[in-house]
């Protein structure tokens, strides 16, 4: 199937995670991004999260690791500066002293979901054969988990009925 690209940036912040999202493991989404043009270069990010608020071991010496994602491939230094500016707006803190750790442009990150997409399609292919995957639900980690759960539940219901 066709796919969508995603680029993820990792930064080490110069402040505690508690200063960014009150120490909560919260996915930050820019609601203003979806009120204007989706390709606005000043708002490249779809979401960002303070990884070390939920997994402190992801950074050493009490550092704060931030993961931020945008649709499309954005490998340039200019893109990183736009991301940094967007992060400053989202977290309401200066980001000029944040350390850029890595950028991962992934051309085939998520399956493209053409409309209409049947998220309730059968998970049973044949007797004893079940199928799951993000492309069968919603193209995301959550979609993959939901699809896996639906398949597992269908399999268990079948096994328990015999």
Language-model segments: residues:
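Conserved flavin/dinucleotide-binding core of flavoenzymes
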Residues: 51, 55-162
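Mid-domain catalytic core of redox enzymes
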Residues: 1-81, 86-90
């Amino acid at each position: 199937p066709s796919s969508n690209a995603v680029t993820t940036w990792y930064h080490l912040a110069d402040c505690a995670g508690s200063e960014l999202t009150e120490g909560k493991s919260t996915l930050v989404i820019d609601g203003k991004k979806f009120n204007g043009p989706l390709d606005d270069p000043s708002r490249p990010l779809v979401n960002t999260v303070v990884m070390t608020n939920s997994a402190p071991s992801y950074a050493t010496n009490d550092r704060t690791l931030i993961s931020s994602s945008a649709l499309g491939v954005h490998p340039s230094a200019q893109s990183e500066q736009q991301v940094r500016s967007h992060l400053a707006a989202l977290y309401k803190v200066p980001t000029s002293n944040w350390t850029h750790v890595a950028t991962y442009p992934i051309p085939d990150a998520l399956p493209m979901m053409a409309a209409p997409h049947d998220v309730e399609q059968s998970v049973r292919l044949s007797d004893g054969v079940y199928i799951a995957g993000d492309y069968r639900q919603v193209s995301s980690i959550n979609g993959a988990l939901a699809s896996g759960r639906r398949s597992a539940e269908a399999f268990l219901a079948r096994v328990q009925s015999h």
